[in-house]
Amino acid sequence: SKTTLIADGGIKFSGDIAKALAAGADAVMIGSLFAGTDQAPGRIIKRGGKLFKSFRGMGSIGAMNKGSADRYFQSKQKDTSKYVAEGVEGFVKYKGTVEKIIYQLVGGLKSSMGYLGAKRIKDLRKKPKFVKITKAGFYESMVHNIDVIKK
């Protein structure tokens, strides 16, 4: 039987999705990219003239107190002050509707597929080519020496 492989964590850009799928992932978890959207749980607040939305990772103490402790093998712990956090709570920039983010992620994935000549996601896995670059090279490959005013 085939084991399903899910890339969980570290997905920040559409290229990360393409790399995970090319490496063999069947799915990706991209919860942090959706945090701050209208569809994500949490309240919207205004701080310093900007909008933010509360964020609570499933491994945070607050989430475990609300019932996620069993996911982290801590549900048998009766003294909730002894929970060990595997997530955080805080605020993220308010992003509006999730559709905008999904549109950009799909567009970026299509672009990555185009670079590899892959018409379908399964084609990404046929001949993936991974090139190791340094951290400096990574930052050099991003937009630099410019103040981005609009994406």
List each language-model region with its residue ranges.
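Alpha/beta catalytic cores of nucleotide-metabolism and tRNA/nucleoside-modifying enzymes
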Residues: S1-A7, K12-K151
